[in-house]
Amino acid sequence: MLDVNFFDELRIGLATAEDIRTWSHGEVKKPETINYRTLKPEKDGLFCEKIFGPTRDWECYCGKYKRVRFKGIICERCGVEVTRAKVRRERMGHIELAAPVTHIWYFKGVPSRLGYLLDLAPKDLEKVIYFAAYMITSVDDEARQRDFSSLEAQIEVEKREVENRRDSDVETRAKTLEQDLAELEAEGAKSDVRRKVRESAEREMAQIRRRADAEIDRLATIWDRFRTLKVQDLEGDEVLYRAMRERFGLYFEGGMGAAALQKRLQSFDLEAEAESLRETIATGKGQRKTRALKRLKVVSAFLTTRNSPEGMVLDCVPVIPPDLRPMVQLDGGRFATSDLNDLYRRVINRNNRLKRLLDLGAPEIIVNNEKRMLQEAVDALFDNGRRGRPVTGPGNRPLKSLSDMLKGKQGRFRQNLLGKRVDYSGRSVIVVGPQLKLHQCGLPKQMALELFKPFVMKRLVDLSHAQNIKSAKRMVERARPVVWDVLSEVITEHPVLLNRAPTLHRLGIQAFEPQLVEGKAIQIHPLVCTAFNADFDGDQMAVHVPLSAEAQAEARILMLSSNNILKPADGRPVTMPTQDMIIGLYHLTADRDDVAGEGRQFSSLAEAIMAFDAKQLNLNAKVRIRLSGVVPTSAMALPEDWQQGDDLDVETTLGRALFNETLPVDYEYVNVVVDKKQLSAIVNDLAERYPKVQVAATLDALKEAGFHWATRSGTTVSIADVVTPPNKQAILETYEAKAEKVQQQYERGLITDDERRQELIEIWTQATNDVAKDLEAAMPTHNTIHRMVSSGARGNWMQMRQLAGMRGLMANPKGEIIPRPVKASFREGLTVGEFFITTHGARKGLADTALRTADSGYLTRRLVDVSQDVIVREDDCGTFRGLSMPIAEKNSDGSLRRHDDVETSVYARTLATDVVVDGEVVLPAGSDLGDVVIDALVERGVESLKVRSVLTCESRVGTCARCYGRSLASGKLVDIGEAVGIVAAQSIGEPGTQLTMRTFHTGGAASESGDITHGLPRVVELFEARTPKGNAPISEVAGRTRIEETDKGRKIVVTPDDGAEEVEYPVTRRQRLLVEDGTHVEVGQKLVQGAVDPKQVLRILGPRRVQMHLVDEVQEVYRSQGVSIHDKHIEVIVRQMLKRVTIIEQNGSELLPGELVERARFEEENRRVMAEGGQPSSGRPELMGITKASLATDSWLSAASFQETTRVLTNAAMEGKSDPLLGLKENVIIGKLIPAGTGLPRYRNVRVEPTEEAKAQMYSVPGYDDVDYAQFGVGSGQAVPLEEFDYGSSDYR
């Protein structure tokens, strides 16, 4: 077998008949599969052992040779080779066709490749292939010219002969008529009898004339057709064609079906065709030019590769190995078989029938019909349903053809190559394990035993609890007591991977150290739930065991949960204490007045704890405690002679002192109430300033304290805790009066219906807000629900408002707001009518969520596909370019404050140019920008920075570490080999389900630009580079505007400053203008409200501006939903969208006009041309949507496994594409290690050697006295170096 690690590229091409025959191990001649009596394969059938190999290991068909000792022998009786049965998975056969057939992919695909090559319309092509028209394959022009006059004379002679015959026939008939009339007259017949005779004679004569004229016309037609006959003409009139063939058969050849095409392809001159097409492109315009360009692409594909166009017509069909289209016996003696077998049987049956008809010399029409049926059978085998009605099996189900085997989610690519199942895995329900450390998980004993079975068995043998592996296996299966001891020894320090589906980002699979637990549920640390998005309502998780030492090392170093504290999307901690822990810490750090022990002083924390235990001190009482090792805050009053490290009297509460015990020793004393915001700031700070180990320990301590005090806080909820605001009725009455007034104005006709709606909505929104404010003021702070909401543990004021205040305005099914509010709260209970109008929104919400999940998953899939080959390949690409970004904004008093978007823009990047303040370099280029550095710069008055960005990176493949900046997940500069493309796709896709789906309708005049697309559809629209609905034009020139009214709408006319031609922009009356008459506009300025078309931005303002536009617009959507994603992730995707250039002028290069090429290749080719003194080609940057960009990738494997599988493979085979295997998907498909992370050669080619100390420790021998072993002398304690030690020598015994 071919080893996957020994090739660098994978090429796909068109197989010729010779190729198919060389792959084959024999011809399949019969449609039989297996004998239903003996259940053995039939000879020469679709499962024949002689062709495909034996069905049993080392055993021939007739049973003469059995056992492995006959390996390789071919039985002389049955002709079967004695070998392993698994060769039936790799040996192919073939069917020799009695007539050639075309490959449906090349004839029926869009565009038809055969049609482009031969310049035939697909309809005409179909007529030829399916025997509805003849095609001329060759014309002997010389002979025709040479014999032209004699042929013409021959035709003239024939015509004259016909004329002469006609004249003589008419004459004879006239004579007969005269005789008849004379006879009748003699008999004295009546005049009408005579008239009838005359009329019938005249009719006959007219018919003779007509027949002769028709014959003459036919001769003329035949001659005209022959005279102008040229290669590739189609002739649908069979009679005419036959007559032509009879007369002038020496001068031309023609035919129908695939055979005619095959003949044409053999004589097709590719080079001449390419030359004439180039000429057309150079001189032609419009439609002709575009068609010539498309045709040239196909023609040059055949010219430049080893492919021959004859490969598109098949003389024999390959038969795939039988084990890939199996036939299995079911219980009832019936057989289940793969659809392919049925399709192959149709082909073989029709082929055999055609052979027989040809042998019998059947009439042409019957043979042609059989050939057409054979063509259809082969079409159905390759791609059933592509042409005409699909072939159906039992129950009218279309049969699955070879193409269907590859296509779609259930196809070979996505189901088997990219979605493999793995061994050493198990799954179970999860429960919480609050006693675990951050890097641990609880693994049920039975699961652990099954997963680590091989390890346990080996260890049992090593410790000689079992004689051999077999008895060890028996011991494990019987679960002997000693097995459990061995198991706990085996799993120490052997991490396992836990994964929860759906794995939306890389934190969905993490490594933990297993702790054996009783029961059958996996226990999970509460802090990693956020990363897994897990809860304990019946979720399940999967466990995987890393086997090799390398896999274990990677799991421990890269995947251990305590090393994955930061979220790759924004670089902020993901292991945040939540819910109970927050309420516990809030309870711990709150301060209360008038409680036991207030105002006391304690000499130490221990003393205060003692007082607390004696019930003399309340946890939240304000007291003074003398603490040691405190890091004071700026707000604390310090004694004059105090130094760092001295004891300090702190005004605090016992709870806060205990809370500070959980934090690192040198952390600033926290003397405030700790709610969710505060806690999040503390954890952020820890992650930024302390090593991972310290952070993990602190988080565990916070978790312990949180749960401990949450239990003791006695947080409960009862219906009495839901307090209704006291002034609710009064508030509602005032607003009711206002609403009544508006209604009256409407009824009097003073305002329109839209205005009434709008005003009512505003009134009731205000009312709802007032009730909410009243509620917030009226609720006592020690109320448990109030504490839950204000601490940030669960719920928000809006939910509170609905529970205790009023539900407010609701939307109808169309998404418009109903102008009557729901005045009741859930505490009071809703009326039937109110309940009914609330159901619309609830139902829509559920439907929305279901749709959103699917859409978001598909978006993630497309993002991954477009960015999967973006890997950090080098340390620095050496560019000087970068993007300028703001880091500060001015307050009203002129002072600077940190810009709101620094978190997602400048943070974690590399500085591109030195920062200079007053001539002094404050920060050199190449510095990493963290929180501390940015704050320092803002203090120095720096407002914006030029930073490195992926968009300006000049690496040829992937990107470089400096342009990418910090890896957000590790907080350090990104490692070479990091798959930043996948991380980016996951970071954008993972919060996709949180985005809304709705297009908001506020109904009426409130909406500014019609319906703005928001949420997920907007993100998709941007990444697919679609023109948005109701897009706003942007000015192409700088100049003054004037607005003109037309009968259809309005138009904005811009008069350029440089006196060029005026530019007009038609806009509808509904669009809100952003300019007035006489406004001065700049290039690229928006003229009306609405979304801008990114393609226009690219055309008018260039690639850099469109990149910034896309990043900002995507961020706009995510920010509006409160999702924080770093710009660099979006930049990675946008960079992939603008990676290609469309060639406009070819000039001296080899690039074809209209071709899409990667910018790197375009620049390389131009450099080559210029070095040779030629003229470089010109191109324009192209903005491609992510789907299109994925399909345009250099890797055909990746594109085929993404979408439109058959189309991608058709193209790739025709162009003889070679896959460089640079991305991740391609390597997963062929089973290589991915070229990212530790799969890169720079990490693979490493030797591990122990240090001297390690060697000494490992091999040291205890010294022994010379008394014990006198003859040896004193032991040196020196280890024997391994390489000098010969295990095989006899003296070793």
Curated annotation (Swiss-Prot):
So which residues are the signal peptide here?
none
| Cofactor: record remark | Binds 1 Mg(2+) ion per subunit. Binds 2 Zn(2+) ions per subunit.
- Its EC top class is transferase
State one molecular function term (GO).
DNA binding
Q: Which cofactor does it need?
A: Mg(2+); Zn(2+)
Q: Where does Mg(2+) bind?
A: D535, D537, D539
UniProt keyword Lipoprotein, yes or no: no
Question: Which CDD domains does the record associate with it?
Answer: RNAP_beta'_C, RNAP_beta'_N
Alphabetized, the UniProt keywords read: DNA-directed RNA polymerase, Magnesium, Metal-binding, Nucleotidyltransferase, Transcription, Transferase, Zinc
Q: Which reaction does it catalyse?
A: RNA(n) + a ribonucleoside 5'-triphosphate = RNA(n+1) + diphosphate
Question: Which positions does UniProt annotate for Zn(2+) 1 binding?
Answer: C60, C62, C75, C78
Concerning InterPro entries, the annotation shows: DNA-dir_RpoC_beta_prime, DNA-dir_RpoC_beta_prime_bact, RNA_pol_asu, RNA_pol_N, RNA_pol_Rpb1_1, RNA_pol_Rpb1_3, RNA_pol_Rpb1_3_sf, RNA_pol_Rpb1_4
SUPFAM superfamilies from the UniProt entry: beta and beta-prime subunits of DNA dependent RNA-polymerase
Task: Describe the family membership recorded for this protein in Swiss-Prot or TrEMBL.
Answer: Belongs to the RNA polymerase beta' chain family.
- Quote the subunit structure annotation: The RNAP catalytic core consists of 2 alpha, 1 beta, 1 beta' and 1 omega subunit. When a sigma factor is associated with the core the holoenzyme is formed, which can initiate transcription.
Q: What role does this protein play?
A: DNA-dependent RNA polymerase catalyzes the transcription of DNA into RNA using the four ribonucleoside triphosphates as substrates.
Q: What is this protein called?
A: DNA-directed RNA polymerase subunit beta'
UniProt organism field: Kineococcus radiotolerans (strain ATCC BAA-149 / DSM 14245 / SRS30216)
State the encoding gene.
rpoC
